[in-house]
Amino acid sequence: MARILAFDIGISSIGWAFSENDELKDCGVRIFTKVENPKTGESLALPRRLARSARKRLARRKARLNHLKHLIANEFKLNYEDYQSFDESLAKAYKGSLISPYELRFRALNELLSKQDFARVILHIAKRRGYDDIKNSDDKEKGAILKAIKQNEEKLANYQSVGEYLYKEYFQKFKENSKEFTNVRNKKESYERCIAQSFLKDELKLIFKKQREFGFSFSKKFEEEVLSVAFYKRALKDFSHLVGNCSFFTDEKRAPKNSPLAFMFVALTRIINLLNNLKNTEGILYTKDDLNALLNEVLKNGTLTYKQTKKLLGLSDDYEFKGEKGTYFIEFKKYKEFIKALGEHNLSQDDLNEIAKDITLIKDEIKLKKALAKYDLNQNQIDSLSKLEFKDHLNISFKALKLVTPLMLEGKKYDEACNELNLKVAINEDKKDFLPAFNETYYKDEVTNPVVLRAIKEYRKVLNALLKKYGKVHKINIELAREVGKNHSQRAKIEKEQNENYKAKKDAELECEKLGLKINSKNILKLRLFKEQKEFCAYSGEKIKISDLQDEKMLEIDHIYPYSRSFDDSYMNKVLVFTKQNQEKLNQTPFEAFGNDSAKWQKIEVLAKNLPTKKQKRILDKNYKDKEQKNFKDRNLNDTRYIARLVLNYTKDYLDFLPLSDDENTKLNDTQKGSKVHVEAKSGMLTSALRHTWGFSAKDRNNHLHHAIDAVIIAYANNSIVKAFSDFKKEQESNSAELYAKKISELDYKNKRKFFEPFSGFRQKVLDKIDEIFVSKPERKKPSGALHEETFRKEEEFYQSYGGKEGVLKALELGKIRKVNGKIVKNGDMFRVDIFKHKKTNKFYAVPIYTMDFALKVLPNKAVARSKKGEIKDWILMDENYEFCFSLYKDSLILIQTKDMQEPEFVYYNAFTSSTVSLIVSKHDNKFETLSKNQKILFKNANEKEVIAKSIGIQNLKVFEKYIVSALGEVTKAEFRQREDFKK
């Protein structure tokens, strides 16, 4: 008699379901946008952040140069105004025929300069003052910069200064086989001319020295001030306030990941896990001395190879550890850098940890050196340590590490040490009826990925809406899509795999047609495996003929790890075999079934080498029983990923639930046998298997409704269902030979599986509920993106688009294009459209509003007038003859009816095209197959991938109304609101 909520959480979707007393009460879908650039995966805020950073950098440089200009003007008795530019024009001091500053920098070493030329040399060096601190550059850029700096440093050995080097090597030198000059400065994405700032500072000092020798008179104070201002560097911020708190001691900060104690903890964890695995698989018991021998090797050198590990443990060189890959078992690159920078020392462990902490938190080199000076370090050590780059923290503090590491040194695993010390993760005792915002919980520091944060935010929004509508529940089941928590490149790889999988299925469908096979999921999979296995049986090595594929009884799809023991229904756990081989294998792994037959096993090993690595490992696995003992099946049933546990704990720790029955144990983890918990994280593997078994079609990823089907399955994936399903699969595997002998049909199995359906008529009931869903989308009201395009253009470039100079002036007046710093740019995003209606004609008009309008706090009041290409009409002033209706934002829900439609339809607003005065709209569920006759009139160019209508003219719409959709998909008409002004 439980009330259960279930969620299928993706990076841009939430599927949800609510069941009460085993009855499906409600389900729905929420779709939202990923907060990232779809092409690059970069944050949507990145362009603004980079632009803001560039503005600040340029402003600082301008202030620095202005300061220098004042100093120079005062010292050299020059006019400061001559060095200032106005309205983007060239400053007076730089007009006329002038010698290149590179040539002047060379001459400065050999002859007396004029005051004006000396001023230009100082300003030129100060403007492009080289690279100093590149700690915060990304790894790829940093590597290129360092390489170029080193190469140029070697070349500089033959010259007095940087200026002389650049002048003689590159100035007015032709490119090879070209009439173009070589670049003296770096161009975009070029690092060849990168010079260390220290060399430029040395050059300016040398020029001051030489000019004084040549008779140029200036004060020592002036020289010192110029050098100080020209090479001034702002102190970097301290980020200590951003460090999260310890999982066990909430008043303690987390330990730096690159501290010696943290390295010891990580090394101990890996070594203990390795020794325990050897104990379980080989029955070998290792002592505390063995553990210490391995640990000492790591702490001495920062590395431990697999070869060293085998030698220290007395294993043969050809022994292969589980997961062995590459040379190193443990490699701590940062630890190696740390011990190298330290050299010989007499520092305590605590001091070393504090030093690592300072390096991690203090990003300003001068401040860091001051902090390091309080330790027993010489200047060389301080200089070396200050160059290190440390970041990131563990989840626990030094205090916790100092408690657990002594027990781990005795050979206890981390969780065993925590249990012995009674260390428990701090939990929230103040449970709420509604889930609080993630950033108000002690998990707030665990996630910084904006894509994941958006998914968690939308999950909370839907969850709280359901709790408000239906009240408290007993349980919440969640499934996180595998792309949640992945970075953009990882998600792109997943998407590529999905597309390849889709293509392979479509190709197999065509092949089925050619061979006269029924087009069903089973035959499609058989054909895919047939091709992957190069037309050979995975266990016998016999050639599979086309006639074998056409005979339903000849071949079977086998689960490499028996499904009833693994719950692994993935493609990588399936092979195509002759029925006879499957009958022999039964409910066993390949090694358990055929390992005693050495000749056959050798053949299987050879065959497996031609298969994907993941499949190969499963086939050749000799230790599956050990994995079973380690809850391997549970891990396939339950999602143990970090991000899944995080969402689970966030929900469990802060939400108040209805009490579970007395015989349910809520103290056990959801992966432990006999556990009964309020929140469970289900595996996508389980959902996929039940989806197939209960007769739901394969996912159509273009159709949003599949998220709700998954949520329903998650809601009913309880222990009793899973057990019944497991028993059913076990019977299939164990009695395979007998069943085939009796020719039991697939229909018999379909009837048998009904015994573990949640209730009678389950599939149809779910499909009926799915048909009732209106997909919810949040309206995107917040202005975002750049104010205008980056490229500045000449006025003439717009003449063709707007019909000459007068047209461009008109376009500027209407805000179609913008003038910034005397140049013209295209608009940024249109984030809002205000809809008006003529009081007499009832025709609709649209006033576009861009991010630039929002930034300028100027509300446009002219509606777009349609014009032909190459001309521009006056837009229409929305005066007293027009009435304001509503504002549209991206994903606003509207009800529209064109003149050809029989009735109005709900659609989501996507965009407005000012050139055609028309809307772009989309169907809520993006489902092509269910388009009604009326909808087909609207979405006449729809296809399976997208149901979108473009060029919907607004003036003559019969119905044009705005609606509000809740997080649960409940639709209500929007109340009238006064037009919103930016100034309010």
Swiss-Prot record:
Positions bound to Mg(2+) 1: 8, 479, 483
Origin: domain of life: Bacteria
Keyword Transmembrane helix (UniProt): no
Described function: CRISPR (clustered regularly interspaced short palindromic repeat) is an adaptive immune system that provides protection against mobile genetic elements (viruses, transposable elements and conjugative plasmids). CRISPR clusters contain spacers, sequences complementary to antecedent mobile elements, and target invading nucleic acids. CRISPR clusters are transcribed and processed into CRISPR RNA (crRNA). In type II CRISPR systems correct processing of pre-crRNA requires a trans-encoded small RNA (tracrRNA), endogenous ribonuclease 3 (rnc) and this protein.
Assembly and binders: Monomer. Binds crRNA and tracrRNA.
UniProt remark on domains: Has 2 endonuclease domains. The discontinuous RuvC-like domain cleaves the target DNA noncomplementary to crRNA while the HNH nuclease domain cleaves the target DNA complementary to crRNA.
Name of protein: CRISPR-associated endonuclease Cas9
Species in which this protein is naturally found: Campylobacter jejuni subsp. jejuni serotype O:2 (strain ATCC 700819 / NCTC 11168)
Highest classification ranks of the organism: Bacteria, Pseudomonadati, Campylobacterota, Epsilonproteobacteria, Campylobacterales
